[in-house]
Amino acid sequence: MNNKILEQLEFNKVKELLLPYLKTEQSQEELLELEPMTEAPKIEKSFNEISDMEQIFVEHHSFGIVSLSSISESLKRLELSTDLNIQELLAIKKVLQSSSDMIHFYSDLDNVSFQSLDRLFENLEQFPNLQGSFQAINDGGFLEHFASPELERIRRQLTNSERRVRQILQDMLKEKAELLSENLIASRSGRSVLPVKNTYRNRISGVVHDISSSGSTVYIEPRAVVTLNEEITQLRADERHEEGRILHAFSDLLRPHVATIRNNAWILGHLDFVRAKYLFMSDNKATIPKISNDSTLALINVRHPLLSNPVANDLHFDHDLTAIVITGPNTGGKTIMLKTLGLAQLMGQSGLPVLADKGSKIAVFNNIFADIGDEQSIEQSLSTFSSHMTHIVSILNEADHNSLVLFDELGAGTDPQEGASLAMAILEHLRLSHIKTMATTHYPELKAYGIETNFVENASMEFDAETLSPTYRFMQGVPGRSNAFEIASRLGLAPFIVKQAKQMTDSDSDVNRIIEQLEAQTLETRRRLDHIKEVEQENLKFNRAVKKLYNEFSHERDKELEKIYQEAQEIVDMALNESDTILKKLNDKSQLKPHEIIDAKAQIKKLAPQVDLSKNKVLNKAKKIKAARAPRIGDDIIVTSYGQRGTLTSQLKDGRWEAQVGIIKMTLTQDEFSLVRVQEEQKVKNKQINVVKKADGSGPRARLDLRGKRYEEAMQELDHFIDQALLNNMGQVDIIHGIGTGVIREGVTKYLRRNKHVKHFAYAPQNAGGSGATIVTLG
């Protein structure tokens, strides 16, 4: 498609409307390169992607993608065997992480049926080994200490040396305060110094590094810290060297995967671009138009995208219709209507939503040509008419039946009679060539051409004779008429002059009356359509109100049922507590054996009313929690014993997992790590008690995990667990309750305090869960 039409219709300004929605530099580059397409399947694919994104937002109400810098230049540098700096590696790390997040997001899209985006999601690849290694680069672009043992050693030594220097200088600040111009430790050339008064410079032995501009202060590095500062300088050099070595190693890790990473980055950027199109469509009440296969155009309530308060209009350009001629006076909005059609076509053929209502339809043109406004060439010293005619000649030479042609004020700039004749001849040529054309003109002769010629239709812009102002409403099928007499009368021209003028134009009076009648019919039709639309809007509002009331009612009902359930549970808990008290008294009196107490307690539990809530749909819906999923390669984890973050890289045959933690590979069982994502931690726990054999052979240990449980559910499981532990003669058990809000932990503590079979309990050691777990000794 020719680029001139993009400039004439200011298509770049339309593209700029999408910029605020973009988060990645890749999508910004894609927007910059966006141009109209001439192949219907490609346009359809773009529209399908927007429809898919709409389905995602309906299901999830969001589509999370982080800001990503362009990594194209960094990938080129890798291909040239150049090492990347820390910021470039951080940008690639974010792409790898975003790719992994997007793959997990796609796997959770259960109720979305895709037409196009599924292929993009499925082409994303994960790099668990790379992600694990890249944990050594934090989000601030800093290499963590654990990036290598050598780096950790250097930084630890550097910290110690700096602390010693600081301590020595702080002691000197106190001892030599009267010799100093300021009570602070300064830095010159990367070395710690003291600001000494020039008059006392000989009182402190050391190296002078700087003198203040006034000469009153000398910055001295005391001899006591010279050696330490030299060590620090050397350690910093060693640190830079080690960091360079690590960055080189990271660059080498990336090189074999450049093509795949580049593809991932493009997919993420394109998904961001599709997201931006959807948000633009949603915010501007735009639509995805249908694509006609017979050059039919139908734009319903179409608006100009660059105007702040555009008037919506309907435009129908049927297959058989070749030309629409908009007649009438200037300043009525004819040119705006012309540009609105052109921009709607450009946006649609570029795969963008069109500012129109559902049901709109675009055609696919190989080219769109326009002669709009005064494009007079000063260099060529051409008149307005010559400039227009030169452009029109060029259009007529290039346009074919797959083109759309837009003419503004066709035939203007010359003798009206000759200009009108030229305009009709040009339109006739285009009509016979089956080239769709929309033209504006103020020549009345073209009204007759539109009425008398097949496949040509008149149109006009509505004018309010009462306010003497245009309404900018497009009236298709109604030719424009002059409002000169009405305007002149309202502005105070003598009635006899207006009457005389009318008598001079009697030959046109019949035509004007017909036009007036057509206008009246069009206005009445529009009034009825507006009324129908108002009724439709009222119906929509009513439906929304009914849905809102229903949702509020359902919410209140669920709350009441939950409240009733909690009250019932409290009654049961009270009864069980009373039973514990009774059993305690019995045991104190009769010294019953533990298993006899458990049997008695079971009998008392049977006395509580067993209400079957499993079939209660409301409670099931309220309590439904997404089933736990197994870990998978690429998941981010926290190693429980160390608190370090890592990434799962592979699963061994025996069920254990290999994980990359910094630059260290670890082999872990599934209970030695937890998934990072909070929403994946809230899973329904298996009520089975796992007995773990201790390595020292001190006997069996049982562990109960209460994390993620409701309070009452946790207390019931704890009670049952202690009973079973007593029956199995277990001496010690572990209760994992987590830290969280502390409610479960407090409940566990209270229960253990009042249970006479608990000999001792305390929080676990720090390396075994700390205050998130309690070790219980039974007896």
From Swiss-Prot:
Checking Gene3D superfamilies in the record gives:
3.30.1370.110, P-loop containing nucleotide triphosphate hydrolases
Keywords per UniProt: ATP-binding, DNA-binding, Endonuclease, Hydrolase, Nuclease, Nucleotide-binding, RNA-binding, rRNA-binding
Keyword Nuclease recorded: yes
| Top-level EC class as recorded in UniProt | hydrolase
Asked if rRNA-binding is a keyword of the record, the answer is yes
**Protein origin, superkingdom:** Bacteria
One Gene Ontology term of the biological-process aspect is:
mismatch repair
Pfam families attached to this UniProt entry: MSSS, MutS_V, Smr
Task: Write down the SMART domains for this protein, in alphabetical order.
Answer: MUTSac (SM00534), MUTSd (SM00533), SMR (SM00463)
UniProt EC number: 3.1.-.-, 3.6.4.-
List each copy of the Smr domain by range.
Answer: 704-779
GO MF: ATP binding; ATP hydrolysis activity; ATP-dependent DNA damage sensor activity; endonuclease activity; mismatched DNA binding; ribosomal large subunit binding; rRNA binding
**Stored HAMAP family:** MutS2 (MF_00092)
Q: What PANTHER family does this protein map onto?
A: OS10G0509000 PROTEIN (PTHR48466:SF2), OS10G0509000 PROTEIN-RELATED (PTHR48466)
What the entry lists under NCBIfam families is as follows:
mutS2 (TIGR01069)
Main function: Endonuclease that is involved in the suppression of homologous recombination and thus may have a key role in the control of bacterial genetic diversity. Acts as a ribosome collision sensor, splitting the ribosome into its 2 subunits. Detects stalled/collided 70S ribosomes which it binds and splits by an ATP-hydrolysis driven conformational change. Acts upstream of the ribosome quality control system (RQC), a ribosome-associated complex that mediates the extraction of incompletely synthesized nascent chains from stalled ribosomes and their subsequent degradation. Probably generates substrates for RQC.
Query: What family classification does the UniProt entry report for this protein?
Result: Belongs to the DNA mismatch repair MutS family. MutS2 subfamily.
Instruction: Return the protein name.
Output: Endonuclease MutS2
**Organism field:** Streptococcus pyogenes serotype M1
